[in-house]
UniProtKB/Swiss-Prot annotation:
Key component of the proton channel; it plays a direct role in the translocation of protons across the membrane. GO terms for cellular component: plasma membrane; proton-transporting ATP synthase complex. Its main location: membrane. It is a multi-pass membrane protein. Belongs to the ATPase A chain family. The keyword DNA repair does not apply. Gene3D superfamilies: ATP synthase, F0 complex, subunit A. F-type ATPases have 2 components, CF(1) - the catalytic core - and CF(0) - the membrane proton channel. CF(1) has five subunits: alpha(3), beta(3), gamma(1), delta(1), epsilon(1). CF(0) has four main subunits: a, b, b' and c. The chain crosses the membrane at residues 32-52, 82-102, 112-132, 141-161, 181-201, 206-226. This is ATP synthase subunit a 1.
Length: 247
């Protein structure tokens, strides 16, 4: 069977430079991240600002309204300050996920270092803006209102642990779902190839895994959107903590 993990290997394309003894390389992951950025930029430029929206403009406007409504619902009107960040994260993750479904491409969100970097960006934004806007009142985030004094110390410890584990849970959710989905697709596609090589009987038997592969591909398209949405809405919820730490 073809190795289902091989699709996630990082391959160096060329060396950019060195920091000390550490090589800085341009990899296939870097290339597909740049591709996602180029596709997003191209879509935005192609959209235009026509009074009667075309295909690209309709997609961009729909994406804009979707993210804006999600942010307003989760973080209120003040949350729109972070719209550029949230919209960029949603589009980058969604486009990267969609590109990764195409055969022989690379799924950047299937690498924990990529998803953790995005989650860490959100985490640091929450901390920096939280202290900038609220000062020491930001610590209210760790002291929920209405908690009996007897168990308050325990609750505070739990809240602190929960807060600092956010980058891990935020990143692992996206990484694990994309990794598992692509491994499953690769396994069923391998069954199709193996059975197809066994002659007529094998080709007939390959119809079942082929059908499952097609169905799983459709499911992965939905997962590509859902995982981008989940990452985005969690980002909005975390940003709301920076804006309203006492709520």
């Amino acid at each position: 069977m073809i190795d289902p993990i091989h699709q996630f290997h990082l391959n160096k394309i060329f060396t950019i430079g060195h920091i000390g003894n550490q090589e800085i390389a341009f990899t296939n992951s870097t290339a597909y991240m740049l591709l996602a950025v180029v596709l997003i930029a191209g879509m935005m430029l192609a959209a235009g600002r026509a009074l009667v929206p075309g295909r690209f403009q309709s997609v961009v406007e729909l994406s804009y309204e979707f993210v804006a409504n999600t942010l307003r619902t989760s973080a209120g009107s003040h949350g729109m300050t972070f719209f550029p960040l949230v919209f960029s994260l949603f589009m980058f993750i969604f486009v990267s996920n969609i590109v990764g479904i195409i055969p022989y491409t690379f799924t950047v969100s299937s690498h924990i270092i990529v998803t953790f970097s995005l989650a860490l960006l959100v985490f640091l934004t929450v901390i920096i803006y939280g202290f900038y806007k609220n000062g020491l009142k930001f610590f209210k985030l760790f002291v929920p209102s209405g908690i009996p004094a007897v168990i308050l110390p325990l609750v505070v410890v739990i809240e602190i642990i929960s807060f600092f584990s956010r980058p891990i849970s935020h990143s692992v959710r996206l990484f694990a779902n994309m990794l598992a989905g692509h491994v499953t697709l690769k396994v069923f596609a391998s069954f199709v190839t193996m059975l197809g090589a066994l002659g007529f009987v094998g080709k007939v038997g390959a119809l079942l895994p082929l059908g499952l592969t097609v169905a799983l591909t459709g499911l992965e398209l939905m997962v590509a959107f859902l995982q981008a949405y989940v990452f985005t809405i969690l980002t909005c919820i975390y940003l709301n903590d920076a804006i309203h730490p006492g709520h």
